[in-house]
């Protein structure tokens, strides 16, 4: 019994080995739906190549002028699905199986087959959708392409307007920050003798010229008042000099008394 069991196990092992070494038929009907079930890098690369072959075949077919518009739409939908499936395999190869980074390589080259289609914002098919071959000449697709071009121009114009507004806003902010940093000393409203700022009534920041004129007028008025006071003092001094002395007063009184006595004898 043990001998028969060993023979059976060896036969089973040989069967598994032959299955693993046998070439895989990478037909699209046999392509696994669960990408993560493939754990060997070589198999994942093979399935990716099979998708590329299918994409190339359908790109040739969608450019055929003999097929109907219905067939063109059908092929275009299939191409979008194939490109999405190809991208999923590329992520699996790079992230899970640590293989080549096809995403980065294809993103930096124009030779990728996906670049043969035009990328359009289509709300019915999803946010973005690609149209290949004759699908780009379909009436509804042409209309969407024109609308997308207009939207891109409007977005560019809005970006330019936003840029201009941001520049103006920066200038205003810069002016405000500069205006806030300028104090009263900048306009000459600082009294160095008293070591203090002048009052707001004397320092009208709105018009420095007016403030200067008011300040100068005040200085002239003060000088004129001082001059008038000096003249008044001089006049007072002169009147004090005219006051008679005691001798003069006595002489005047004697003369006055003499005149009174003489008038009595007459």
Curated annotation (Swiss-Prot):
Gene3D superfamilies named in the record: Helix hairpin bin (1.10.287.660)
Annotated spans, Disordered: 147-177
Domain of life of the source: Eukaryota
Matching InterPro entries: Helix_hairpin_bin_sf, Isy1, Isy1_sf
Keyword line: Cytoplasm, mRNA processing, mRNA splicing, Nucleus, Spliceosome
Disulfide cross-links: none
GO cellular component: catalytic step 2 spliceosome; cytoplasm; post-mRNA release spliceosomal complex; post-spliceosomal complex; Prp19 complex
Localization, UniProt: Cytoplasm; Nucleus
GO biological process: generation of catalytic spliceosome for second transesterification step; mRNA 3'-splice site recognition
Family: Belongs to the ISY1 family.
Function: Involved in pre-mRNA splicing.
Assembly with partners or alone: Associated with the spliceosome.
Protein name: Pre-mRNA-splicing factor ISY1
Origin organism lineage: Eukaryota, Fungi, Dikarya, Ascomycota, Saccharomycotina
Gene giving rise to this polypeptide: ISY1
């Amino acid at each position: 019994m043990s001998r028969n069991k060993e023979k059976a196990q060896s036969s089973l092992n040989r069967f598994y080995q032959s299955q693993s070494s046998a070439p895989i038929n990478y037909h699209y009907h046999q392509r696994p739906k669960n990408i993560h079930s493939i754990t060997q890098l070589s198999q994942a690369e093979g399935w990716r190549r099979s998708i590329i072959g299918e994409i190339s075949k359908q790109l040739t077919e969608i450019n055929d002028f003999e097929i109907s518009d219905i067939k063109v739409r059908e092929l275009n939908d299939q191409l979008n699905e194939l490109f999405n499936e190809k991208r999923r395999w590329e992520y699996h190869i790079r992230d899970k199986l640590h293989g080549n980074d096809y995403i980065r390589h294809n993103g930096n080259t124009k030779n990728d087959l996906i670049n043969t289609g035009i990328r359009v914002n289509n709300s019915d098919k999803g946010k973005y959708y690609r149209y290949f071959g004759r699908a780009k000449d379909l009436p509804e697709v042409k209309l969407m392409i024109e609308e997308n071009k207009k939207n891109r121009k409007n977005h560019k114009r809005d970006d330019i307007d936003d840029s201009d507004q941001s520049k103006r806003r920066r200038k205003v902010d810069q002016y405000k920050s500069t205006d806030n940093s300028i104090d009263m000393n900048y306009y000459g409203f600082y009294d160095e003798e008293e070591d203090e700022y002048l009052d707001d009534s004397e320092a009208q920041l709105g018009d420095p010229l007016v403030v200067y004129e008011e300040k100068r007028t005040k200085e002239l008025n003060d000088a004129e008042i001082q001059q008038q006071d000096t003249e008044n003092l001089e006049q007072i001094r002169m009147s004090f000099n005219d006051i008679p002395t005691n001798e003069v007063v006595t002489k005047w009184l004697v003369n006055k008394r003499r005149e009174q006595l003489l008038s009595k004898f007459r």
